[in-house]
């Protein structure tokens, strides 16, 4: 991840008017939170304000956007209903040029989840009520979690058909994955975006997992350093 500059603005409410201090510090790609904390301490020192007196901290970042553009997000694994692992590949068949084979389809050539990491799980819910037609095979979930851990994949999504009607299988699968791979970031599609239509739900969850690990560490600021 390339280095850039962080803009830090401090507004200090005075008795008659608000005072504003501004500073810039280099970003710290190895640990984005480090640069933010450094910038806050620097602008507080510049304004003569005790960091512990900060009441509200707003934070805006393009870290997630840059990860998507530069294609350097997390390696993602996926557990999905057997027979439906190619939903992320097919999408909605909307293409830039419907009848041309000579163009790039980004979600196929640069998928958020590589096909080999999309693992099918035997389970099935039925609309319109979400009743369980085929119980989830928990052994398959454990085997899939073990395989993804062996591959060094620490960001995993669980995306089952019709989970917006009943997320029982997804939540249980998430628990099983964590029991095998406790350090993994695990996202259930029904928790990320609980909407009808599989592609929209699956792809949104995949995007969340793609940017999630780095974004999480970036947003988990060591506030103890500000006291």
Task: Label the predicted regions.
Residues 217-223:
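Conserved small/polar residues in nucleotide/adenosyl-binding loops
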Residues 16-23, 112-132, 198-206:
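Gly-rich Lys/Arg/Thr-decorated short loops/hinges at beta-loop-alpha junctions or inter-strand turns
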Residues 159-169:
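Glycine-rich phosphate-binding loops at beta-strand->alpha-helix junctions
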Residues 74-130, 189-193:
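Active-site phosphate-binding/coordination module
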């Amino acid at each position: 991840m390339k280095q850039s500059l962080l803009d830090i603005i401090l507004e200090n409410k005075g008795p008659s008017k608000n005072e504003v201090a501004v500073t810039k510090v280099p970003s710290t790609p190895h640990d984005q939170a480090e640069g933010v904390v450094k910038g806050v301490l620097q602008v507080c020192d510049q304004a003569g304000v005790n960091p512990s007196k900060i009441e509200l901290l707003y934070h805006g970042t393009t870290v997630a956007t840059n990860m998507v553009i530069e294609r350097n997000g997390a390696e993602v694994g996926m557990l999905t209903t057997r027979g439906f692992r190619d939903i992320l590949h097919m999408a909605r068949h909307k293409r830039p040029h419907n009848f041309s084979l000579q163009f790039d389809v980004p979600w196929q050539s640069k998928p958020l989840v590589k096909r080999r990491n999309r693992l099918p799980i035997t389970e099935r819910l039925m609309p319109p009520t979400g009743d369980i037609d085929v119980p989830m095979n928990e052994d398959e979930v454990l085997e899939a979690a073990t395989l993804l851990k062996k591959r060094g994949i620490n960001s995993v999504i669980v995306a089952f058909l019709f989970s917006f009607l009943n997320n029982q299988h997804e939540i249980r699968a998430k628990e099983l994955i964590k029991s095998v791979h406790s350090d993994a970031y695990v996202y259930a599609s029904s928790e990320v975006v609980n909407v009808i239509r599989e592609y929209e739900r699956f792809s949104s969850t995949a995007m969340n997992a793609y940017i999630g690990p780095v974004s999480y560490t970036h947003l988990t600021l060591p506030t103890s350093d500000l006291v």
